[in-house]
C-alpha cells in the first residue's frame, strides 16, 4: 500500500470529476458536477479518461527465482477517439513520451513485482507502478491479523526459458515472459484464470484493455487494473454484504464503504475486497483504497479490478470454498467467541426514551415468557435525541446504574447506541476541534460541518474509550457501533494518510476501538456494528442495516447476509421485520423464524417491535415460539459458533459452502445453512409453501413435521407452527436444551440429543460454557 495518494501541495484532488468515455462509447461528464459528498466512487472511470496516460504490462525483463523479485516493462499508450460509420469510440494507441527531461522519465518504464509463497495454498503477488516501493514492514496493516508468516517449503520454483513456474500440491502460478502474463492452475494443471493480454481480444468492437495502470493527468497519481479471465460457466462470490444475486458475474461492484440505507441496492455498508470462484481459486486485494470490480459486466470474459492504489498487493488462494475462506480468514483474522448472552434475544426499537420504558419492556418479556437477554436503548437515551454525549438523560433516567444492575439480576444485559459524528450543537464539538481529535481537510479545518472522530490519532482513541469505558464500567454489556460510512475522503488524517486510504478502513479502526475497550472492561468480545471492511470480522458482530419492512427488504437481507458470510464474516444479524416503517404482522411472522435462526437475533425498527403491542394477541404466542426455538437450539448454536471461530466459516451459510460438489447449490441464494446441519428456507411472500433446493445425495428431514424429502428441487410446505421451512440433514444429531428465559439459566448438564433420519452409528458435537474445545460424542 502507498499512502498520501492524491495529496499534492496540501490539496486533495478528485480525479473522477473529469470528462470520460466508456468502452461502449457512452460519454460521461462530471465536469462542474463532482461526486456528491460521501457518494460511492466508480474507479473504472479513471481507465476511460482521455487525460490520463496508460501503461500496459508487456514483457518480463528479469526474474530472480531465489527471492521472487522481477522486473516488467510497461508500454506507454493513450486513448484516441475514433469515428467509424457514425459511431464514436476510442482505442488505445502507442504514445511517445514528451516528459522532460527525457533522460529522467523513460518512455516505457521498467518496474518491479514480487511473488512470495505464504503457505501451500496461498501466494502473495505484488506489482508496483512506481520505482519507489513500500517497505514490507513500514506500516501495520489493520486488515491483517499481524504480519503473514511465510512458508515456501511446499513450493517448487523453476524456470523454462523465459517462463517461471511456482508449483505446490494444491495449485500453480505460471509467469510467461512475453507477453508478460500470470496464469493460475489447479493441482491437475487445469487453467483456473489468467491475466488478459492484447492478443486475447477477439471482438471487432470491444477491445478489452489488459493488465495496466494509469498515471492521472490531474495529479500524476496512479491506479492499477489487473484484468483476469472469466471462463464459461464460472461463478464468482464475495465482495461483501451485497443485496444483489450471490453470483457476481455480470455485475459491477464499487467497493467503497457507504450508507445505502438498506440492503436493497448494489451499494454496501460492508464492501470486502475478497472473492472466490467455483473454479477453485480466490483473491484478496490487500488495499483500503476504493476498488471497482467489473465482474464480466462490460465484457463477459473479463474480471477487471480497478484499484485506486499505486500497487497491486494480491493474495491468491487455491481450494474449495471452505479451504479458501479458511486461508483468507487466517490472514485477515477470525473472531474470538462472543459471550453466550449475545446469542439470545435482543429487544429494541427506535427508540426507548426512558428508564421506565426499558423496565416495562423487560417486565413484559418475562411476563409473556419470551426468552430474552438484551434490552437495547437506541438514539433516545441522551438529553437530546441523536446527540451523543455518552450520558443518560438525568430527567428520563433517574438512576441508570441501578436500572442496569436490576435488569442484570433478571437476566438482561444493556446495549447502548452511539456514533462517531458530533454536530455543532453537541457539547463535545468545541473540545474535539480544539484538541485536534477530529478529522481535518487539506486546509486544516473540518471537511464537514460535523466533527468526525479521527481514529488514526491515539489521543482520539484514548478520549473515546474513556467515554465508553465509564458506561461499560457502569454495567453496560454492549455498544452499538452505528454509522462509520462517512469518513471524509477529502481529508488528511492524523497518521498522514488521506481519505483515499482511510475512508474504507475507518470502520475497522472504529470497530476495533469499541471492541478493545469492551474487552478491557468486560472481558468480552462483543459490539453491534453496521459498517465494515476487511479485518472487521475480528470484532463481532455486524448487522445488516436499515432494511425496508417489505418482502423485497426481507429477501435482500438474506442475500446480504449470505454474501457477507462468503466474504469471511462468521457472525451476522439483521433487524427482524425490517427497520424503516412499522412491520405488518403478516410479514413479521415470516421474518421472525428466519431472524431467530441467525447467529444473533434482534427485533429492532420503527415501533412497535414488541409483539404484545400488536392488535392480535395471538401474535405474542407466535413470537414466543420463535424465541423458544432458538433457546432450545442454543447448545447447537453455541457449538457451531465455536467451530466458526476456529475455521472462519459463517454461521449464516450459503449452500455452496457445505455442498461445493453439487452444481445446483451454487445457484441458490434465497435459502441458507444455519451452521453445518440445519437448512432454512424463508417465505418471502404470503404463501404456505415454496420451492426449496435440497443439496447433496442424502435425504432431508423437516424439523417441524418430521417428513422426509429426497434431494433436488421440492415444493415444501411450512408444515408446523412457524412460517418457515426448516430442514435437518439426514443422520444429524442436534443437541437441545430445556427452554430458559435467559441464557444464564440454561441447564447445560441436561442436554437432549435429537437424532434425525436414518438410524445407525452417529456422532454429535457439543461446546459448553467453560469448555476450551469442542467435544465429540459417539452414539
Segments predicted by a language model, with ranges:
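Aromatic- and carboxylate-enriched substrate-binding clefts and catalytic-loop regions
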Residues: 128-130, 138-144, 194, 224, ...
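N-terminal accessory segment at the very beginning of proteins
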Residues: 21-332, 340, 350, 357, ...
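An acidic- and aromatic-residue-enriched active-site/binding cleft used to recognize and process polar
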Residues: 118-120, 128-130, 169-171, 178-180, ...
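Catalytic core of carbohydrate-active enzymes
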Residues: 515-517, 524-525, 532-543, 556-560, ...
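Beta-sheet entry/capping signal
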Residues: 122-123, 172, 181, 273, ...
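Acidic (Asp/Glu)-rich catalytic clusters
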Residues: 333-336, 366-369, 562-563
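Bacterial Sec-dependent N-terminal signal peptides
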Residues: 1-31
